[in-house]
Amino acid sequence: MATTKPYRVLLYYMYTTIENPEEFAAEHLEFCNSLELKGRILVAKEGINGTCSGTVEQTEKYMEAMNNDPRFDGIVFKIDEEEGHAFKKMHVRPRPELVTLRLEDDINPHEITGKYLEPKDFYEAMKQEDTVIIDARNDYEFDLGHFKGAIKPDIESFRELPDWIRENKETLEGKKILTYCTGGIRCEKFSGWLVREGYEDVSQLHGGIVTYGKDPEVQGELWDGQCYVFDERIAVPVNQKEHVIVGKDHFTGEPCERYVNCSNPECNKKILCSEENEAKYLRACSHKCRVSPRNRYVIQHELTEEQVAAALEKIEAGK
């Protein structure tokens, strides 16, 4: 693999048994710090889910150590080359589950999961009739980018997906169901849950959107927008053939791919907005959030009460 940039971002997961997640997390954090990696890794009894960044040498050492651990035999690393770190710190945290579905009867992907489709097969399947493409990510991820024709479930987070499926059973019954997510981890469980619910033809995009975008054959075709990632990059390109912007500015509806968090820490909603609108609307998604005494934009820019009042007046006048 020809390396052109000094840093790498690794994205990976594996469903495998980790007997003591708390102990493993503490030891793994120490190991990652010794390599000077930065990132976010979740550990549970059911496995590991991580993204981390470091130099080529640091990431090579990390991958070698993981590959030499029998628990992670066969682990696949998705690699992006970057100019610098994608994280500020290193976190390794134990969790009850790797992805938050909170099912009463959990799914073990080693026992039940949907069919794996490689990018080319997924591409062909998307073009077939009687196919339903379900985005298994959060709403703000979909809004930044998605496959053409994909359904956006009316949910805010992944754990709400099973309820949405049950509510829309009549629409989905008898259809070929395709599911996809960023790297594949959410679909391992979600597709398994669909199979358990009685859906007969369920497939998942093997390796997720990230793998699809790197595939030399499909080159990300049929994807619109960008792919949301959980690090400081926020978004990465997928479609190598054309770039269609699907994101819309929260305030004006104009094409936009720039995410910020609402300045009210009690809200913290992710909103797409231009730099101009961020300043105009004090980076707040609503009037209620703009007038919050804890508005981070106001604090960060040391705005006076008069300046805030003038900004609010300008917004009101523009309605």
UniProtKB/Swiss-Prot annotation:
UniProt GO BP: tRNA modification
Residue numbers annotated as active site: C181 (cysteine persulfide intermediate)
Pfam family, one: Rhodanese
Sorted UniProt keywords: Oxidoreductase, tRNA processing
E.C. number: 1.14.-.-
Reactions mediated catalytically: uridine(34) in tRNA + AH2 + O2 = 5-hydroxyuridine(34) in tRNA + A + H2O
PROSITE patterns: RHODANESE_3
Top-level class of the enzyme under EC nomenclature: oxidoreductase
Listed GO MF terms: oxidoreductase activity, acting on paired donors, with incorporation or reduction of molecular oxygen
Domain Rhodanese: 127-221
Database matches in SUPFAM superfamilies: Rhodanese/Cell cycle control phosphatase
Entries under SMART domains matching the protein: RHOD
The protein's role, per its UniProt record: Catalyzes oxygen-dependent 5-hydroxyuridine (ho5U) modification at position 34 in tRNAs.
Stated family: Belongs to the TrhO family.
Official protein name in the record: tRNA uridine(34) hydroxylase
